[in-house]
Structures are given as C-alpha cells and as structure tokens.
C-alpha cells in the first residue's frame, strides 16, 4: 500500500483549471516586462554594481584590470581601483 494523501490538489488539476491560466496569463508576461525594464533602464547595473558598457575603460586606465599574483591580489586591486 502506498503512502497516504497529503490533501493537496493534484498538479494536473491545477494546470488544467481556468483560474490558473487567468492568473498566469497576467503574471508571466508581467514578470517578463518587469525584467526587460530592469535591464533596459540600466537599473540592473546600479543594483548589482557592475560597470556599464561604456565604463569598463576610463581615459586614465586603458589596460585590462587583471590580477596577476594571487598572493598580492589585495595590493593589485587597490592599485587598479585607485583612480576610480
């Protein structure tokens, strides 16, 4: 004999109901639009602190900011970010 029922609705009943699709026909496109706006307005750059595409290289620093020695990484990072 298998385990007892948890009392929850079967997933097949949920995804075949009209109520499910009425709710999700609004929420799924809304999440897509919200994500698109989050990225296209540049808010994602501000929230996560990543540089915008035109900010990777400044006029003062044109080299690629690479850390070469892992034992002196802190000092190298301080030198790289000194002009920022």
Curated annotation (Swiss-Prot):
Cited Pfam families: Cytochrom_B559, Cytochrom_B559a
Compartments, as annotated in UniProt: Plastid, Chloroplast thylakoid membrane
Topology with respect to the bilayer: Single-pass membrane protein
Presence of keyword Transcription regulation: no
GO biological process: photosynthetic electron transport chain
GO MF, one example: heme binding
Transmembrane segments: 22-36
Keyword Nucleotidyltransferase: no
Similarity section: Belongs to the PsbE/PsbF family.
Name used for this protein in its record: Cytochrome b559 subunit alpha
